[in-house]
Amino acid sequence: MRLFHFVSIVSLFTIMTMVSSVSAEEQYLEFLQGLRDKNYHDTALQYLDQIAADKATPKEIQELIPFERAMTLMMFSRTQTQPEEQEETLNLALAQLALFTKQYPNHPMAGTANTERGKIILEKAEVEGRKAQSPAEQNNKKAHQEAARKLVAQARDIFQKAYNLHEKTWKSFPATFIDKQKEPERYEARAKAEIQFMSAQLDLAQCTYAEAQTYDPGSADFNRLLKKAAEEYAKIHERYRSQVGGLYARMWQGKCFEEQGELGQALGIYNELLGHPGKSSAIKGLKDNCLQFRLICLNDEKKKDYQLVINEAEEWLKDNRSRSRTAIGQGITWELARAQEALANQESTKKGDQDRILRQALANARFVNAFRGKYRDVSRLMVGRINAKIQGNSGGDPQDFATAYGLGQDRNKQTKTLKDKLAAAKTPADKKKAQVELTQFMEETARILRIALKLADNKTDPKELDHARFLLSYTYYNLRRSYECAILAEFVAKSDDKVNGGMSLDAAYLALAGYLQAYNDSPK
């Protein structure tokens, strides 16, 4: 299990206490974080290069650029599939942190940078763990596991020093009440010290969890360390149960139970946290993590509660369209695909429903497979499995542009019939069935049009090629894949003017509609 959801969120505790409420600074960092949340890490790195070269960039932001570049590289590494590439990216991140602390040793974020160094080292330990799991590295498995343990020990040493420092700072404040109105600076200082002390405790507990991952699942050392980590998380939760950090500790206590096979205890904790009344963005992020972990439990062989996974995952994706591309969104979509494939393969599923459910699983697996990261390989295998079952029914995919383009045009015309069917549906059950049918049909239309674009060559009519792009963009719009719609339509609007000016205006309108839809679907 990757650590990044926890690592990223816990990192925010200290950062939030250090960044002042200067609007200009918030503007730069908020935009940067938005790019990273969407997994546009290459664009985020380009943005950092751009503002680094811009003389108008505030001094406070200029100083933070090496630090933010390191954070971006660390997040980027989580989307890479090859351990060697991940290791190289993480080393670049460490170099940027070293540059930051060298250039600005007295910067308020210098301490945070050192803590983040420990977290990057933990990420490197996970990379070694991935190497140990590789079939090609089985002869070196023990060596990779030992290397991972050494890296965890290095990270623990960094976190222990931070713990000692933050504990001392925290204990320097009296345990008595501090009036926020009368002593605002003192109140804020103690609150900041408490957050840093809590984060240090979480980091140490995370080291114990990470060390468990360096042993084979189910082994005595694996279970021993997971039990120890669960106890450490429990103590943190007991101390900070009313704070976000304490709630995250509770969630990771549940994760430790889950990985020991104690699904009942894990689900009890996840359900408890999902029922938390909080509405803040931090609590929402916590609940999203808990939902993903809950779906993993429900998909387990011991539970096989596939229909419940489908219901809960589809509900989350419907309510969080703009977040489907995030790490959490990809994880939830992957659990949805797993549940759909498993449900379709159950003997109790009617044959008439099997093909429909398999095609839904196929669409979700393809969506996840479009992103770099931990789900790419497993989703590729799923796509292959499902295709092997349903490919023969359709006679295979088109083998030339003209056939694929013509099929895409025909399917685009048929979409209206399915939309009318949805509009005419009376009962909620009929509406849901019609919506599923429409979505599935449009996903297949998009796939056919993508095949057409891949089959295009230098003999393809430029007008037909741009029209195929336009149809694909329009299909994306109907699927509410707004970013894909806007980017592709904007490309057509700019390129088609030289070929067929009549389509460029329509494409420009479609691009604007895509951006507007993306804005309307974004969290308010």
Describe the role of every protein-language-model region.
Residues 1-6:
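Positively charged n-region of N-terminal signal peptides that target proteins for export
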Residues 7-18:
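Bacterial N-terminal signal peptides
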Residues 21-524:
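Acidic, polar-rich low-complexity tracts and alpha-helical solenoid repeat scaffolds
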